[in-house]
Every structure is written in structure tokens, then in C-alpha cells.
Amino acid sequence: PITIGGESRRLQATRIPTYLCPSEVRDEMRLKNGEPYHFPLNYGGNAGTWFVFNPAANSVGQGTLCTNRKLSMGAITDGTSNTLFWGEVKAYTPYFRNAGISGSIPMPSDPSLISGLGGDFKSSSGHTEWVDGRAHQTSFTTTFTPNTVVPYLVGDTLYDIDWTNQQEGKSMTASTYAAVTSRSYHPGGVNTTRCDGSVQFETSNISLPVWQALSTRNGREVFTED
């Protein structure tokens, strides 16, 4: 625990202003049994396109925030100005996790298919744990373009969800694939940071191939931005 303003609390429940966007509508502590538990974040690391981590092979995806890895600038062979580092995410995102599908999972092209992949549904806790380090809490992927609605309908409630096949570190066999969409409350797009430190506003109508190319550190894609 740490002491802030005379109050003792867990470090994980500390509000870090740098991690939060002023537009976030739920800039609030997450509670557990009425007690401070976690605090959310609005900036997730680039975990690549879809594949995140294979525990059996200890292999990782092509993003810049990788499980059990530290990357040097030299690893970003696509160029630091052409590679995403951080992107906006919404706090308290609903998601599915731990479907535990074995083997390779093809990257889906239709957002409406995501909920059918299954798993344990959590209605409002994605991107609420800045200390967690797993894709659905502290990252984003470029499976879909920014602010794409990934629908899951329960009765009259439509959720805009994320999905991760397996929490990193929870299985030695099931790989982590993740559709964790970059989202914001800004009209028309999301704020991002590239590996050279520059800040860019990426529009929601960016082409998917370009968006995905920006998320690979060594994909050698050739693309032109609008």
C-alpha cells in the first residue's frame, strides 16, 4: 500500500492522470466489495494485429508491447515513425476472455462474429487495471479499425466488446489471440503515439490494411497514409 493524502491504498487503485484522457466518461475507481481495487486507463500499448502470445513456443506477435519481452529500437525495423506505440482505449470495456480455443485461430474480418468465439463474459471491467499487463487490460490490437463496434446483444442491451482467447500467463497451451479495439469518446477517431514520440489522430475511417501495417514493428509493409 501507499499513502496519498493521508489515505492508505493499494498502488493498483491509484489514479495516474497521465494514463487518462479528459474525455473519458468513467474516470472513476473500480471497487471490489466496496473497497478501492483498481483504476482504469485510456492509453493501451500496441499488441499487434491479432496474434499476441504462444506460451508453448514463447513466441509473440508483431506489436511493440509484447509478453515476456523487452524490445530495443533496433527491433522496430519498419521505422519508429511508421509504428504505433500507444493508442486510445475506453475504460470499463465489456469483453470475453478465456475461450481457450486450441491451435491457430484465423483473424476474423466481421466484427459480428467475435461474440460467437465465446469465453467468459465480463460486462464492464476491460481496461480498468493499468497494472495488469495483459492485452485486454493494457493494450489494443488492430484486428478492426478505430471505434469499430464489435456487437454482443443480450436482451435489449447491446455491448461493444473486446475478446481475448486466453489471458497471458493462465495457460501453457492455449495461445492468446485478441480483438481489443482502439476506441475513444472523440468524434471521428483516436489519438495515438508512434515510436518516435509523435502524436497522431487516426481517423475511424483509416483503411484496415494501413491501420494494421502501422501496428507491426517488422512487417515491411508498403503503404501510403492519407
Walk through the language-model features, giving the residues of each.
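Internal low-complexity, small-residue/proline-rich segments
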Residues: 1-226
